Amino acid sequence: MNYFDLFSLPVIFPIDQTRLSETYRELQKQYHPDKFVMQNDSERLRAMQKSTEINDAYQTLKNSCLRAQYLLLLAGLDIALEHKTLQDTAFLVQQMEWRETIAAFTEDDQDKMDEFALQLQQQVAGLESKIEVQLQNDELEATADSIRQLKFMLKLQIELVLIEEKLFD
């Protein structure tokens, strides 16, 4: 059973996050290991495994990047453990510029940081839309490249948060 089936969701990139969360809570109640404490060892083990599967599926489906990777896996392309890098020169140059921008922020740049965070969020949203279209068109290699870009953007968002915490805490 794939993760989408487990949560009774269609196998598509955009998902109903509310429905995902509601189904997660229902499944966790149903398969929580504490409910099986009086069962035999094999039933307790089965409940623990099912609970772990539910948690893994939920973490994968709620995260757009992991969800896109999982859809690629279902389509026959596994990029989870690859070490392939982007070959998009323009994006690589943009990466360097973004990193320089983040490195240059000071305590006086809160407004600039907020603006930059908004730009990053717009980039992420654009990549997610691009991935959705690429998946619909079965453009697996192009989707893989977009996922690599999305991973970078999500890491960059985390770096920005860490810089803000360092500067303002």
From Swiss-Prot:
Pfam families: DnaJ (PF00226), HSCB_C (PF07743). Gene3D superfamilies: DnaJ domain, HscB, C-terminal domain. GO terms for molecular function: ATPase activator activity; protein-folding chaperone binding. It comes from Psychromonas ingrahamii (strain DSM 17664 / CCUG 51855 / 37). InterPro entries: DnaJ_domain, HscB, HscB_C_sf, HscB_oligo_C, J_dom_sf. This is Co-chaperone protein HscB homolog. Keywords: Chaperone. Interacts with HscA and stimulates its ATPase activity. GO terms for cellular component: iron-sulfur cluster transfer complex. Belongs to the HscB family.
